[in-house]
């Protein structure tokens, strides 16, 4: 069996989702007690945060952190055989693209031998810069996808000015002769294709297709989420969300 690229740390726990407070705090119950969990997801997590649903949390690496747990995933459609996990930790795509690069599992990055995270370009800081002998610099920006509508995995799940800025930056990169790639990690199993959520953020959706026409590469990969961790799955085809 192939090794999972991003195993969860030891000591993860499941509990019952109660509520979300002030965007970055989530209350869950575990063994009858209330536990507060940190969420780094600023999106709406539309359709996922249902009271009574099972959630997965990992222990904080820093034992002195105010909230001792980090929100990793939500169970969708119950705990039975029809249910599945949806990964909600927005740091996962960045870690996944790096792990997949070093494991040789990014076909669109073949030939590149240097991966540098969080690199500055002008006034922006992008998630990764890849370089290789005789190849144009490849800039990568990562996004987490948790929403599926009518079998289409969609991004974003809330209006994102920052996301629109990133698309403009990527188009500028291509115009200057370098490569630019968006890495969308769809952390759920039920979407069969991927597209921008024009109903939620029409500006982002318009810029997405403008970026495609300009030569920005779109790489929506499936993330295979289980209680053991997250692995990288197949690339999803693009479609328009209508």
From Swiss-Prot:
Give GO terms: molecular function aspect only.
Answer: DNA binding
Highest taxon listed in the record's lineage? Bacteria
> Which Pfam family is one of this chain's hits?
SfsA
The record ties this protein, via InterPro entries, to: SfsA, SfsA_C, SfsA_N
Q: Which family does it belong to?
A: Belongs to the SfsA family.
Name of the featured protein: Sugar fermentation stimulation protein homolog
Q: Which organism is it from?
A: Nitratidesulfovibrio vulgaris (strain DP4) (Desulfovibrio vulgaris)
